[in-house]
Amino acid sequence: MRLSFPRLSSLKLMAAGAAISISAIVIAAPAPDPTSAVGLWEQVDEKSGQPESWFKITEKNGVYQGNIVKIYFKPGEDENWVCDKCEGDERGKPVLGLALIKGMKRNGTAYEEGTIMDPRDGAVYRALMKLSPDGQKLEVRGYLGISLFGRSQTWNRLPDSALAPTPPPTRGPAPKGPPQKK
């Protein structure tokens, strides 16, 4: 006895293959870890309560870094700010896009052994980060020597969708130095 199967057109076969592939990708894609600092964060001025900048924290091979992805400039400040007091490869580069947080290693909800740079003066500080239990706040602490001698900020998590892809701005060469009032 010979079994016969209906013949499927090549278009139907391709559609079926694509559907299977897409469902496999969706099933295999890891769910975001709500206890991870990876994501988009808003830095808020402690005095005014106004947002100052956004950082995108990423992880590669167990090491976390934070790049500045948005800066809220005050009226009259130079929007083409470059880090002229930074050391090494960062010197003279636009602050927007720089990795200001580097070398963080995760230890539960804490991130340790990293550094944070102040782009206004190029100073590099040791740093710690601690994620809140609900994953919506990130305490970022920069310090000299021991953690006791430092300063902390609390950043607020933003949805990753808040950072819509936009084409890079087309501007002339960026002037050097921190933002200056005009």
Model-found features: residue ranges?
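Bacterial N-terminal signal peptides that target proteins for export
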Residues: 2-18
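Compositionally biased, proline/threonine/alanine/serine-rich low-complexity intrinsically disordered stretches
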Residues: 29-32, 163-182
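Central antiparallel beta-sheet cores of small beta-barrel/beta-sandwich binding domains
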Residues: 43-45, 50-127
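Surface-exposed interaction patches
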Residues: 109-154
